[in-house]
């Protein structure tokens, strides 16, 4: 196993632990908490794939980070922050809409890269809107957090979500996945539209 893969996982585990401590003090906003939940699933998937214990990896990650901080000057930190482009977090859905459980009468599931597409084929003759929470950088979709399909009544009838065990996807993956879910829902004579925010970037 590549040593960089292991050390990267260890550092990610420790940084997630710090962010969790921050959230436990009720200091995180909605985008922060969304990323925290998503990254927890990703770390579990990576840990399982690598065969590494998360608690042990967190301790090792702490040692790596402490060593880096000992060598870090304030001036170097300012330069690093200034050189990193900032991403924007855009939200169509509330936390309640993102976390709500939903069920399918006739489930269908497909994959587009590392994205999982799920939809209920029992839904017919409905007006449906696709809403998503995602981040944008350089005016391009960077990371899809979650996309869901809602009827006018507010029922969830479809979803696109990243697989925790396969981190990383492109904006093309997202566009392909959206095409799949639209095609699948329109097959049953549903009318599907995409939110204005999502239209601009996907």
Curated annotation (Swiss-Prot):
Residue numbers covered by motif Nuclear localization signal: 34-38
Major location category of this protein: host cell
Biological-process GO terms, alphabetical: symbiont-mediated suppression of host cytoplasmic pattern recognition receptor signaling pathway via inhibition of RIG-I activity; symbiont-mediated suppression of host gene expression; symbiont-mediated suppression of host mRNA processing; symbiont-mediated suppression of host PKR/eIFalpha signaling; symbiont-mediated suppression of host type I interferon-mediated signaling pathway
Positions of transmembrane segments: none
Gene Ontology terms, MF aspect: protein serine/threonine kinase inhibitor activity; RNA binding
Gene3D superfamilies: Influenza virus non-structural protein, effector domain, S15/NS1, RNA-binding
Keywords assigned by UniProt, alphabetized: Eukaryotic host gene expression shutoff by virus, Host cytoplasm, Host gene expression shutoff by virus, Host mRNA suppression by virus, Host nucleus, Host-virus interaction, Inhibition of host innate immune response by virus, Inhibition of host interferon signaling pathway by virus, Inhibition of host PKR by virus, Inhibition of host pre-mRNA processing by virus, Inhibition of host RIG-I by virus, Inhibition of host RLR pathway by virus, Interferon antiviral system evasion, RNA-binding, Ubl conjugation, Viral immunoevasion
Any one of the GO CC terms: host cell nucleus
Domains: entry comment: The dsRNA-binding region is required for suppression of RNA silencing.
Subunit text: Homodimer. Interacts with host TRIM25 (via coiled coil); this interaction specifically inhibits TRIM25 multimerization and TRIM25-mediated RIGI CARD ubiquitination. Interacts with human EIF2AK2/PKR, CPSF4, IVNS1ABP and PABPN1.
Annotated family: Belongs to the influenza A viruses NS1 family.
Known role: Inhibits post-transcriptional processing of cellular pre-mRNA, by binding and inhibiting two cellular proteins that are required for the 3'-end processing of cellular pre-mRNAs: the 30 kDa cleavage and polyadenylation specificity factor/CPSF4 and the poly(A)-binding protein 2/PABPN1. In turn, unprocessed 3' end pre-mRNAs accumulate in the host nucleus and are no longer exported to the cytoplasm. Cellular protein synthesis is thereby shut off very early after virus infection.
Name assigned to this protein: Non-structural protein 1
Species of provenance: Influenza A virus (strain A/Duck/Czechoslovakia/1956 H4N6)
Gene that encodes it: NS
